[in-house]
């Protein structure tokens, strides 16, 4: 090996997860970012592949691999392969993609493809089996993306945010997601906060059709004494937690803030929290998941 070659400069991403969750789209996004990509690499070839990367002496330093479920030996061979890569001085990030049962079933019906574990079983049963087989691997993942509500373009954008040229320079990247409990909680959230106890702009006729991006709604929510106390305490809690997440090696944290419909209170607080955390030198992304849903419909604050 040439003197001066720094193996810590190697960025290897292993893409795995549920069949039908979008692994092919994810690796195409990484290819657009300049990664050397290999689809469907058998896990037992990981150590040999690592040797080839090291012997390239830095000519290939951004690598993305898709590794799919491959029967009962999948976990043993992958775990051993990751261990051997670590012994070679190569650290891998695991990106795990998942989606809800309903979405996966719909995707399979639309594509008319067979699930890799189907055999004679129903698609639903195959999905449940795969979830069980991948449960431990999901727990080891560095990053998890739930693609249930994502278009191909949105998934690509998330991959760009996670692995783009500036992604490695921040000690911790934080995604703050506002959402409505009536639509379910974000499946990839690490922290969830229910703010339905705060004053609800929905019941103010002049504010009902506005959102937390509008100044009148922000003033209504933030002027409440309860909101002021809550924001001070919650911000203090996050300031305590974030350095500990960083110390444990976590690179991406998803914070969910939910109200009833995801349009007023949660949007306001997500924006305000993001503005406060930017001053703490974290890379912040804000997503308002449900802000455009059910406009003019029932209770939606």
From Swiss-Prot:
The keyword Flavoprotein is annotated on this UniProt entry: no
Annotated S-S bridges: none
Keyword terms of this UniProt record: ATP-binding, GTP-binding, Nucleotide-binding
Protein name as it appears in the record: Nucleotide-binding protein Helmi_06460
Pfam families: PapZ_C, RapZ-like_N
Binding site for GTP: 68-71
Residues where ATP binds: 17-24
SUPFAM superfamilies: P-loop containing nucleoside triphosphate hydrolases
Natural source organism: Heliobacterium modesticaldum (strain ATCC 51547 / Ice1)
InterPro entries: P-loop_NTPase (IPR027417), RapZ-like (IPR005337), RapZ-like_N (IPR053930), RapZ_C (IPR053931)
Task of the protein: Displays ATPase and GTPase activities.
Family: Belongs to the RapZ-like family.
One function term, GO molecular function aspect: GTP binding
Span of the signal peptide: none
């Amino acid at each position: 090996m040439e003197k001066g070659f720094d193996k810590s400069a190697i960025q290897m991403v292993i893409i795995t997860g549920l069949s039908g969750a979008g692994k092919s789209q994810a690796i195409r996004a990484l290819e657009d970012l300049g990664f050397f990509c290999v689809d469907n690499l058998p896990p037992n070839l990981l150590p040999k592949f690592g040797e080839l990367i090291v012997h390239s002496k830095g000519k290939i330093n951004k690598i993305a691999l898709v590794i799919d479920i491959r029967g009962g030996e999948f976990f043993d061979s992958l775990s051993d392969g990751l261990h051997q890569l670590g012994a070679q001085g190569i650290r891998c990030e695991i990106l795990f993609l998942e989606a809800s049962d309903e979405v996966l079933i719909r995707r399979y019906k639309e594509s008319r493809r067979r699930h890799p574990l189907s055999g004679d079983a129903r698609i639903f049963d195959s999905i449940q089996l795969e979830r069980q087989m991948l449960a431990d691997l999901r727990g080891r993942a560095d990053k998890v993306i739930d693609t249930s509500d994502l278009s191909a373009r949105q998934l690509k954008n998330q991959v760009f945010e996670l692995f783009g040229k500036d992604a490695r320079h921040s000690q911790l990247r934080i995604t703050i997601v506002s959402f409505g409990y009536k639509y379910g909680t974000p499946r990839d959230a690490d922290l969830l906060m229910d703010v339905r106890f705060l004053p609800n702009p929905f019941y103010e006729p002049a504010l009902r059709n506005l959102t937390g991006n509008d100044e009148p709604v922000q003033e209504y929510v933030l002027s409440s004494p309860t909101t002021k106390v809550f924001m001070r305490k919650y911000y203090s809690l996050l300031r305590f937690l974030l350095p500990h997440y960083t110390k444990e090696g976590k690179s991406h944290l998803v914070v969910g803030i939910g109200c009833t419909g995801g349009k007023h209170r949660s949007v306001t607080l997500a924006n305000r929290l993001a503005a406060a955390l930017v001053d703490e030198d974290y890379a912040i992304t804000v997503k308002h998941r449900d802000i455009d849903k059910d406009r003019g419909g029932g209770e939606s604050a």
